[in-house]
Amino acid sequence: MKVLFKKLKDGARLPEKATAGSAAYDLYTAEDIIIWQGRQIIPLGFAMEMEDGYEALIDPRSGFSSKGMEGYLVVDYVVETNGYRIEGTIGKFTSMTPSRFDCDVIEGKIDSDYRDGVGVIVCNRDSRAFLIKAGTRIAQMTFHKVETVEWEEVEELSETNREGGFGSTGTK
């Protein structure tokens, strides 16, 4: 399948596989970005076009999921200029040694008819803001065929031995 890639920011990188056997394409940050507490979208600096009948899924990288997201601690500060307070200004970094933060990539979906900029949703549960540098592998993308289904409303469904759902079969 051919996927068209349109750069929206100079720092945008083409998604690429880390190894020949990789199932997913790594996604990179296009510029330095501060990750504040809570949810936010990290723009990747590109748009794409894929064939009809497919979707792209954005997933976390396993290292970030198991160890926390890598970044650089930011110290917030307030700037006062001519009597005005400017809060939330990008702070200075306490260290250029990376740390791990309690921040996760939230799974996302891209439909085949979406043409705007691609972004990664993150949720920072850490109380500290941190910087992710441009070129950081932030998430991964896979492509999947989407089937069109025909729905039919019925009064009854066929019976099975299953019931309960949501963990009802246990863990062992």
Protein language model features and the residues they cover:
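DUTPase catalytic domain/fold
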Residues: 1-172
